[in-house]
């Protein structure tokens, strides 16, 4: 999902992630209409069907790698032995099983992001939501993380990646472009229409003292 500032990305991400409901229309996830669910029902859907990867990793400093990956399974009520087994399997997928007893502070930025990917995978989600997952990484480490996400996609996982960077967006198979809360393109990532042009980026730059990414246009965007 390619976006520029104020495009409606935050609203769309919140709806896709079952953190908010659309003001109009419906949203179906895995054949289930989640657009009218209450908070508890949406929380259950999040635990069962969604995995989240954030720009800043969001690992708990006092927990080791294995405990961080187990956390969503703990919230889902999975028993201890199964939690450990599934968390270790997820760490194996991202190549960090040997770091399971390390604290986050003992890992590089790229390794911490891979731990967050393992945490997202532990619940066997239907969809993985990655919000600017390379934003806090250097270019080489960012490429490694993107490589992991592409690998997961080839293995059958659905990955929705939010980015403002054309060089990242074009690595996807499909791009959805947002502008002013509306989808203006949905299709092949290699189509010229899929790319955000420089003049559009300039138009979307906020003026000094202007609005942040959560602009009124974004707040009012529907599904």
Predicted regions and their residues:
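Conserved beta-strand-loop-alpha-helix hinge in the C-terminal portion
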Residues: 182-209
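ABC family nucleotide-binding domain
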Residues: 1-172, 178
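Short, intrinsically disordered, low-complexity terminal/loop segments
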Residues: 220-223
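Short linear motifs in low-complexity or flexible loops
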Residues: 208, 212-217
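N-terminal non-cleavable signal-anchor helices
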Residues: 95, 196-197, 215
